[in-house]
Amino acid sequence: MYMDFEYQRTLDQHKSNVYKKIKSVNLGKEVVAFTAGNFDIIHPGYTATFEEAKRHCDKFIVFLHGDPSSTRNTKYKPVVPYYDRYKMLMSIRHIDEVYMYQTEEELLELMKTFKLDVRILGEDYLGKPFTGDDLEHEVIYTTRSHEWSTTKFKNRIAAMTFIQNEDLRETLEGIEPDSWYANRILEGNFEA
Protein backbone atom coordinates (compact mmCIF):
# COMPACT_ATOMS: atom_id res chain seq x y z
CA MET A 1 0.00 0.00 0.00
CA TYR A 2 1.31 3.46 -0.92
CA MET A 3 1.85 5.74 2.06
CA ASP A 4 2.33 9.48 1.68
CA PHE A 5 4.90 10.06 4.42
CA GLU A 6 4.62 13.86 4.29
CA TYR A 7 0.86 13.59 4.76
CA GLN A 8 1.41 11.16 7.65
CA ARG A 9 3.98 13.47 9.30
CA THR A 10 1.57 16.44 9.01
CA LEU A 11 -1.29 14.38 10.45
CA ASP A 12 0.87 13.17 13.36
CA GLN A 13 1.93 16.75 14.14
CA HIS A 14 -1.71 17.89 14.11
CA LYS A 15 -2.66 15.12 16.56
CA SER A 16 0.21 16.06 18.86
CA ASN A 17 -0.84 19.72 18.76
CA VAL A 18 -4.46 18.82 19.61
CA TYR A 19 -3.27 16.89 22.67
CA LYS A 20 -1.02 19.77 23.84
CA LYS A 21 -3.78 22.34 23.28
CA ILE A 22 -6.34 20.38 25.28
CA LYS A 23 -3.81 19.69 28.04
CA SER A 24 -3.15 23.42 28.41
CA VAL A 25 -6.87 24.34 28.30
CA ASN A 26 -7.54 21.69 30.97
CA LEU A 27 -4.80 23.29 33.09
CA GLY A 28 -2.80 20.09 33.22
CA LYS A 29 -5.74 17.81 34.02
CA GLU A 30 -5.99 14.52 32.20
CA VAL A 31 -7.12 14.46 28.58
CA VAL A 32 -9.92 11.94 28.03
CA ALA A 33 -10.41 10.47 24.56
CA PHE A 34 -13.02 8.03 23.34
CA THR A 35 -14.15 6.00 20.39
CA ALA A 36 -17.29 3.99 19.71
CA GLY A 37 -18.12 0.90 17.70
CA ASN A 38 -19.02 -2.78 17.87
CA PHE A 39 -15.42 -4.06 17.64
CA ASP A 40 -16.44 -7.49 16.43
CA ILE A 41 -13.52 -9.88 15.98
CA ILE A 42 -10.57 -7.95 17.44
CA HIS A 43 -7.77 -7.84 14.85
CA PRO A 44 -4.42 -6.04 14.43
CA GLY A 45 -6.12 -3.02 12.83
CA TYR A 46 -8.10 -2.36 16.00
CA THR A 47 -5.08 -2.74 18.25
CA ALA A 48 -3.10 -0.31 16.05
CA THR A 49 -5.96 2.20 16.31
CA PHE A 50 -6.20 1.80 20.10
CA GLU A 51 -2.45 2.22 20.48
CA GLU A 52 -2.48 5.37 18.35
CA ALA A 53 -5.46 6.76 20.27
CA LYS A 54 -3.77 6.24 23.63
CA ARG A 55 -0.77 8.31 22.48
CA HIS A 56 -3.08 11.35 22.29
CA CYS A 57 -4.71 11.15 25.71
CA ASP A 58 -4.22 10.24 29.33
CA LYS A 59 -7.39 8.16 29.54
CA PHE A 60 -8.94 6.23 26.64
CA ILE A 61 -12.58 5.08 26.81
CA VAL A 62 -14.30 2.72 24.38
CA PHE A 63 -18.07 2.79 23.99
CA LEU A 64 -19.09 -0.70 22.82
CA HIS A 65 -22.17 -1.08 20.59
CA GLY A 66 -24.16 -4.23 21.27
CA ASP A 67 -25.62 -4.91 17.82
CA PRO A 68 -25.58 -2.17 15.17
CA SER A 69 -27.61 -4.36 12.78
CA SER A 70 -30.64 -3.96 15.05
CA THR A 71 -31.03 -0.29 14.05
CA ARG A 72 -29.07 -0.03 10.77
CA ASN A 73 -29.71 -2.55 8.01
CA THR A 74 -26.36 -1.72 6.40
CA LYS A 75 -24.47 -3.24 9.34
CA TYR A 76 -23.74 -6.93 9.95
CA LYS A 77 -24.74 -8.71 13.13
CA PRO A 78 -21.66 -9.26 15.32
CA VAL A 79 -20.14 -12.74 15.41
CA VAL A 80 -18.65 -12.44 18.91
CA PRO A 81 -21.20 -12.04 21.76
CA TYR A 82 -21.49 -8.65 23.44
CA TYR A 83 -20.00 -9.54 26.82
CA ASP A 84 -17.10 -11.45 25.24
CA ARG A 85 -16.22 -8.37 23.16
CA TYR A 86 -16.37 -6.32 26.37
CA LYS A 87 -13.94 -8.71 28.12
CA MET A 88 -11.53 -8.68 25.16
CA LEU A 89 -11.52 -4.88 25.00
CA MET A 90 -10.92 -4.62 28.75
CA SER A 91 -7.86 -6.86 28.37
CA ILE A 92 -6.17 -4.45 25.92
CA ARG A 93 -3.66 -2.29 27.78
CA HIS A 94 -4.34 0.86 25.73
CA ILE A 95 -8.00 0.92 26.83
CA ASP A 96 -8.79 2.29 30.28
CA GLU A 97 -12.57 1.83 30.41
CA VAL A 98 -15.33 0.21 28.33
CA TYR A 99 -19.02 1.11 28.51
CA MET A 100 -21.73 -0.72 26.61
CA TYR A 101 -24.65 0.79 24.68
CA GLN A 102 -27.43 -0.50 22.41
CA THR A 103 -28.65 2.50 20.41
CA GLU A 104 -27.19 5.68 18.96
CA GLU A 105 -29.38 7.60 21.43
CA GLU A 106 -27.71 5.76 24.33
CA LEU A 107 -24.29 6.56 22.83
CA LEU A 108 -25.22 10.23 22.68
CA GLU A 109 -26.27 10.15 26.34
CA LEU A 110 -22.95 8.52 27.31
CA MET A 111 -21.06 11.18 25.37
CA LYS A 112 -22.97 13.91 27.21
CA THR A 113 -22.54 12.26 30.63
CA PHE A 114 -18.76 11.86 30.57
CA LYS A 115 -16.20 14.69 30.57
CA LEU A 116 -14.71 13.91 27.15
CA ASP A 117 -12.11 15.98 25.34
CA VAL A 118 -11.22 14.09 22.15
CA ARG A 119 -13.14 11.78 19.82
CA ILE A 120 -11.09 9.23 17.90
CA LEU A 121 -12.51 8.38 14.47
CA GLY A 122 -11.14 6.62 11.42
CA GLU A 123 -10.27 8.88 8.51
CA ASP A 124 -13.09 7.20 6.54
CA TYR A 125 -15.44 9.47 8.57
CA LEU A 126 -13.88 12.68 7.23
CA GLY A 127 -16.69 14.86 5.88
CA LYS A 128 -19.43 12.44 6.94
CA PRO A 129 -22.04 12.91 9.68
CA PHE A 130 -21.71 10.79 12.83
CA THR A 131 -23.46 10.51 16.18
CA GLY A 132 -22.47 13.44 18.38
CA ASP A 133 -20.84 15.45 15.60
CA ASP A 134 -22.51 18.55 17.04
CA LEU A 135 -20.89 18.13 20.48
CA GLU A 136 -17.87 20.14 21.62
CA HIS A 137 -15.16 17.51 21.22
CA GLU A 138 -11.94 17.82 19.32
CA VAL A 139 -11.79 15.07 16.69
CA ILE A 140 -8.66 13.16 15.79
CA TYR A 141 -8.93 11.09 12.62
CA THR A 142 -6.73 8.02 12.68
CA THR A 143 -5.15 6.79 9.49
CA ARG A 144 -5.80 3.34 8.18
CA SER A 145 -2.22 2.70 7.15
CA HIS A 146 -2.86 -0.96 7.96
CA GLU A 147 -4.83 -3.19 5.60
CA TRP A 148 -7.16 -4.58 8.26
CA SER A 149 -10.93 -4.31 8.43
CA THR A 150 -13.44 -6.60 10.12
CA THR A 151 -15.25 -7.27 6.84
CA LYS A 152 -12.00 -8.21 5.08
CA PHE A 153 -11.03 -10.38 8.05
CA LYS A 154 -14.38 -12.22 7.96
CA ASN A 155 -14.02 -12.68 4.19
CA ARG A 156 -10.52 -14.05 4.65
CA ILE A 157 -11.82 -16.58 7.20
CA ALA A 158 -14.62 -17.59 4.80
CA ALA A 159 -12.13 -17.95 1.94
CA MET A 160 -9.72 -20.09 3.95
CA THR A 161 -12.60 -22.26 5.18
CA PHE A 162 -13.75 -22.71 1.58
CA ILE A 163 -10.25 -23.46 0.27
CA GLN A 164 -9.47 -25.97 3.02
CA ASN A 165 -12.83 -27.79 3.09
CA GLU A 166 -13.62 -29.93 0.05
CA ASP A 167 -17.10 -30.91 1.32
CA LEU A 168 -18.04 -27.25 1.66
CA ARG A 169 -16.81 -26.51 -1.88
CA GLU A 170 -18.94 -29.32 -3.27
CA THR A 171 -22.00 -28.09 -1.34
CA LEU A 172 -21.59 -24.50 -2.51
CA GLU A 173 -21.10 -25.46 -6.15
CA GLY A 174 -24.72 -26.71 -6.21
CA ILE A 175 -26.15 -23.41 -4.96
CA GLU A 176 -27.41 -20.71 -7.30
CA PRO A 177 -24.66 -18.05 -7.22
CA ASP A 178 -27.02 -15.10 -6.85
CA SER A 179 -28.97 -16.76 -4.04
CA TRP A 180 -26.17 -16.51 -1.50
CA TYR A 181 -22.88 -14.82 -0.72
CA ALA A 182 -21.15 -17.96 -2.06
CA ASN A 183 -20.85 -16.48 -5.56
CA ARG A 184 -18.08 -14.17 -4.30
CA ILE A 185 -16.24 -17.11 -2.78
CA LEU A 186 -16.69 -19.28 -5.89
CA GLU A 187 -15.33 -16.46 -8.06
CA GLY A 188 -12.37 -15.99 -5.73
CA ASN A 189 -13.48 -12.50 -4.66
CA PHE A 190 -12.48 -12.57 -0.99
CA GLU A 191 -12.26 -8.82 -0.45
CA ALA A 192 -15.02 -6.55 0.80
Annotated model-derived regions:
Residues 1-192:
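Nucleotidyltransferase catalytic core that binds NTPs
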